[in-house]
Amino acid sequence: MTGTPLIYVVAVERSGDLLGAALMRSLQAKTGGEVRFAGIGGRAMAEEGVSSAIDISDLAIFGWIDGLMAYKRVKAAVAASVEDILRVKPDAVVLIDSWGYTLRVAQGVRAADPSIRLIKYVGPQVFATRPGRAATLAATVDRLLTILDFDAPYYEAHGLPVTFVGNPTLERLEAGDGTAFRARHAIPAGAPVLTVLFGSRTSEIRRMFGPFARAVARLRQRYPGLSIVIPIADPVEADLRARLENERCFNGAVLVEETEKADAFAAADAALACSGTVVTELATAGVPTVTSYRLGWITWALARAFNLMKAKYISLVNISADAELVPELVQTRATGANLAEAVGALMDDAGRRETLSRKLIETTARMRGDGKASDRAADAVLETLDGSTGQ
């Protein structure tokens, strides 16, 4: 193409916001700054110069019931997003996360202006649930950039060009300094440290805070010198801080911002984490982790009734390794007692922690692929603008 391309990036969750920002940096580098951006995103994309066209704070939604409850809000956001994209008239739109919202935005843009190239960055996990989404996506966008090397056949069967770029999560977390972290926060060198991560969605905080709090209460009784470290995610910061202040088991917990997360991981003996991108980040840092998740009960019942949950595991690390390197306690198993027992099994066995740490690092190294994922994604975006699908 000729001229300076305008690329519109859409991300509504914290992880997608970080992916969008990394992609923008790579596009800037590869074009020598000869690229313009607009979009919808959060703090990370704002730092790269994108003033979000809409407020994304209420759009990070997971599950059918949460989706129904937020239907009017999401419908209005979709309409506003499509209107802004058509007003800006970019050369391409890169849609990163939140399947229901981004799909409807893509469909709206395609219907109104087929000349705008549509690129999905990170596809829905059709290998795990609802394989029909592959055909839906293939009928809507021009190209898929996938972070999983086994994703492609599901989409290519429907004629969608797919490019495996690797997982950018694995490149953005730098090696931390656990010793310096302990010194900064007055944590003794030999004291056990548990990092607790509640999730980045409001619904995750609502469902996981209780079980995690009960687990931490049990663990603090079992390990009197246990230090609790809690990284705070931007979209849910106010809600989480308010809950922590009212829960005695978190008295004295160390709350850290994103800038200290790598050091916090390096200082941790183990982690208790809501399932999501952060589990991959913890694995990259070699932190033995227990992960957990709860869907709304109606959503869970429907998923089981219609056999929609196809995958053996829920975390990408376990799926990639085809082994439960990260213990998963989901739905009815996600109780304070069960979580405390699983974390305690890690805390009590230094040899097991060392073995798991090594296997987690080896697995995420394989997931990373060759080179830098954000650079490969940027190459694919530029190829699409030039009319190539890389096939």
Residue positions per predicted region:
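Nucleotide-activated sugar donor-binding and catalytic core shared by glycosyltransferases
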Residues: 1-391
